[in-house]
Amino acid sequence: MHFIYDCSLFLFKIVIVIFFIIFVSSIILKISRKKNKNFGILSVSSLNDHYELVKNSIIVQLMDKKTKKLWNKKNKMLKRSTLLTNNNKLIDKDHNIIVVRAQPTLYVIDFKGGIAAHEVKSLREEISSIISVAQKHDEVLLRLESSGGTIHGYGLAAVQLQRLRSRKIFLTISIDKIATSGGYMMACVANYIIATPFSIIGSIGVVAQFPNIHKFLKKNNIDVELHTAGVHKRTLTIFGENTPEDRKKFVEELNVAHDLFKKFVKTMRPSLNIEKLSNGECWFGSIALKKKLVDDINTSDDFIISRIRKFNILHVKFKYNESIIKALFYKKLKTINNLIYKYLNNKLF
C-alpha cells in the first residue's frame, strides 16, 4: 500500500512539473510574440570610435599616475554626445548642428553564409538601408565567409550585391577565411576583392549528392510509388529506382547550372580565363591572386584601419526578431537544416 501511495505521489509531481513547464512556455511565447511586432532591428555603430577606444585604452595603461589623472580630466571635459542624421550632419542632444561631415562613409556589413543562404534575409535589409542614404564617394565593405550552398540562395545573394554596383556604389569584398562556390559567386560581384594568403578561394562548379535506398527497400519488401505529371518533374529520387535516362537528365541540369555560373563570373570579372578556372578547383588566397580571382592580399582589419582617417566607418547589421524558443534552439535547427540541404536537396554551388 505504501509503495502504491509513493508511486502515485511521484506521478502526481511529474504531472505538476509538466503542466508548470507548459504554462511557463506559453507565457514566454506570448511575450515574445508581443515583442516581435517590429520584424527586426537595424543597428549602426561607429568603427572609428571602436578603434579609437581600443587605442586610447592601451595609451592610458602606458601613462604614469599623474599623466593618467590629467588625461581622465581632459577626457571628461571633451565628452559630448553626437548623432548622425540622414543629411550627413552631426547634431547634439538639443538638435543643434555642430559640424558638417566632410568625409565620405564606408559602410561595413558581414555575410557568414550557410548552405541555404538564409542570411540573405538580413543582407537585403542592410543593402536597402545603405542605398537609401549613400551619397557620392561612399563605399561598402562586405566581410564574406561562405563555402557555398543552394543555387537559388546564393544566386539571390549575388544579385543583392549587384544592387550596389548598379548604383555606382564602390563595393569591396574581403575574404579572411573562405569564399568558394556560391561564396565566390558573391565575391566576384565586387569592384575589388581582397583575401588573406591562406584563405580558400574558387570552386567554380556545381555538385549534387544524396543517398538512394531503393535496393534496401526492395530487399525488405517495401514498395515506394512516385507519380509525376511531366516526364522530367523528378529526375533522381531517394526512395525510387533511378534509371540511366534519369541520371543523364540530372547531369544535363548540372551542366546548365554550371554554364550559368561561369557566364556570371566572366561577366563580373572579364579578365579571367574562365574555362581554365571553372573546373571546381580551390586555391589559397596567394595563388588565387596570381590567377586574378582576387585583387589584393590583405585582411579586412587592415583594410578598415587604412581608411579610418579618410572615411567615417559605420558597421551596419540587421537582425530579425525571434521568439525566445527559436533563439535557444536556432543553432541546432540550423545544423539540422544544413544537413538536410546537403544530403537531400538538389544541386549546390
From Swiss-Prot:
GO biological process assignments: proteolysis
GO MF: serine-type endopeptidase activity
SUPFAM superfamilies for the chain: ClpP/crotonase
Annotated membrane topology: Multi-pass membrane protein
Enzyme Commission code(s) on record: 3.4.21.-
GO CC annotation, single: plasma membrane
Source organism superkingdom: Bacteria
Catalytic residues identified in the record: 181, 233
Annotated InterPro entries: ClpP/crotonase-like_dom_sf (IPR029045), Peptidase_S49 (IPR002142), Peptidase_S49_N_proteobac (IPR013703), S49_SppA_C (IPR047272)
Name used for this protein in its record: Putative protease SohB
